[in-house]
Amino acid sequence: MSNYWLNIYKPRGISSAQLVSIVKKILGKTKIGHAGTLDVEAEGILPFAVGEATKLIRLLIDARKTYIFTVKFGMQTNSGDCAGKVIATKDCVPSQEEAYAVCSKFIGSVTQIPPAFSALKVNGVRAYKLAREEKKVELKPRNITIYDLKCLNFDEKNATATYYTECSKGTYIRTLAEDLALSLQSLGFVIELRRTQVGIFKEENAIRIKSPDEITKNALEAKSIKIEAILDDILVLDATDSQAQQIKYGQKCLFNYEKDFRHLAKFAYREEFKGNTERSTTAYTLVREDASTGLTYKLPLEVEFGKMSIDLLWVRYKGTLLAIGSLNKSCFNSLRVFNLTQDFF
């Protein structure tokens, strides 16, 4: 198997790029990428894509992420973490009650200004390079979503609090920590940061590597995750021979909603089940029947007659991932086509 995912745990003290070099040295492959850079001082889940899985990295970058981080109150650093130098202090530390209560203020849609020490570009130059040269860095505010935020522990003696958060892509935990502290009339920076989950990838199943000598290629590949795994919650269509050929060669491909979409409600990575439809006067509501429990679940999708617009789904051919794309009035538009079948036709 040469196209797959690896659930790698990045240790603290090395860069994401250094970990890529380690994995490349073990596998002997050049087509490797990762989904979401972690700072040198951070640790945690860093999913790796190998081979054709690299075409799906964007989907994983867009996935929700969870973090556990510890904030030190009363000081601010220029980088937002312990790698930077202290630039301000304030003799004000929140109480335990305040550290817990502040969380509710940040749940939902939030506007963040990314930290100067970030990989974002300013006029073609990485922001962190400008920040290191002590040049002024102005970054535009970004809208992010905090789905969950709670305080796990408060240490009055050391003026620290540890938080858990589930957040959207583009969230900077260093900025979140600073904003939490400011909301508490204090200053703060991150002293520990751990990413515990990215989409389906969790830390309890992660592979921990610090050097190429710690694991063999065969042992690493034995822990691989199939390429379709991250498509678990995306609707899938099965293509016929002719439809697969059209998609493979970039031709226009139509799906008949009276026929093909009757079985649209399938999630390929889970145990297979048969989908059916409930027809109303204006739409089909796709239904999932769970044979193990006998329960029926209505999927959050209504297919309007003649429109059939779906932002994202994937197509498989003979059980193998063929393409991801969108549908517009029953016409499939490919975003990525995959070369996973040896003898295609």
From Swiss-Prot:
It catalyses: uridine(55) in tRNA = pseudouridine(55) in tRNA. It comes from the Bacteria. Keywords: Isomerase, tRNA processing. GO terms for biological process: mRNA pseudouridine synthesis; tRNA pseudouridine synthesis. It holds the Pfam family TruB_C_2. Its EC number is 5.4.99.25. One of its GO terms (molecular function) is RNA binding. The active site is at residue 39. HAMAP family: TruB_bact. Belongs to the pseudouridine synthase TruB family. Type 1 subfamily. NCBIfam families: RPE1, TruB. Responsible for synthesis of pseudouridine from uracil-55 in the psi GC loop of transfer RNAs. This is tRNA pseudouridine synthase B. The lineage of its organism: Bacteria, Pseudomonadati, Pseudomonadota, Alphaproteobacteria, Rickettsiales.
